[in-house]
Amino acid sequence: MGKQNSKLRPEVLQDLRENTEFTDHELQEWYKGFLKDCPTGHLTVEEFKKIYANFFPYGDASKFAEHVFRTFDTNGDGTIDFREFIIALSVTSRGKLEQKLKWAFSMYDLDGNGYISRGEMLEIVQAIYKMVSSVMKMPEDESTPEKRTDKIFKQMDTNNDGKLSLEEFIKGAKSDPSIVRLLQCDPSSTSQF
């Protein structure tokens, strides 16, 4: 009986096959693990923050985890179901650079208006610094979240309107691998793209 519940139904599997980069076997394995960790089939923000904290034991990942959670929770119901989880995981782990950048843009665009303001960028950068600053030495021109935000805006805000469009964000990130690494919160990777 329990085994039947831990397998994806054929129509769900078909949907996920079409919307992710995972194989049927990988989807089934992820689903089993998801149900093991989330028996209700839904992940709350508090549960998500606890899981996320395991990946960043030397920093405070809670604020950044809230932003990631919001971006995973595409229907805005305050929980992440398996479909939301696996689609976001597919984009962030196996998606093409452009997909990852669109996903990152949606995380940085806190109010969903299609632009990233300086304040929105600063909020995310502050969350990243809280998470990694104890284990990462930042260059002098990025030693504070404010300096990092200013540097990003100088590089990306090509029309100087004080906000970043999706186009500016993607173009700017693609032209600076260090920004791509920061946006993906993967400071250890040096030549991912």
From Swiss-Prot:
User: What are the binding positions for Ca(2+) 1 in this chain?
Assistant: D73, N75, D77, T79, E84
The entry marks the following residues as binding Ca(2+) 3, namely D157, N159, D161, K163, E168
Provide this UniProt record's keywords sorted from A to Z. Answer: Calcium, Lipoprotein, Metal-binding, Myristate, Repeat
Sites of N-myristoyl glycine lipid linkage?
Answer: G2
Q: Pfam families of this UniProt entry?
A: EF-hand_7
Instruction: Enumerate the InterPro entries for this protein.
Output: EF-hand-dom_pair, EF_Hand_1_Ca_BS, EF_hand_dom, Recoverin
Q: Which SUPFAM superfamilies match?
A: EF-hand (SSF47473)
Q: Which PROSITE patterns match?
A: EF_HAND_1, EF_HAND_2
Tell me which Gene3D superfamilies the record gives.
EF-hand (1.10.238.10)
Family to which this protein belongs:
Belongs to the recoverin family.
Supply the name of the protein. Answer: Hippocalcin-like protein 1
Please name the source species: Xenopus tropicalis (Western clawed frog)
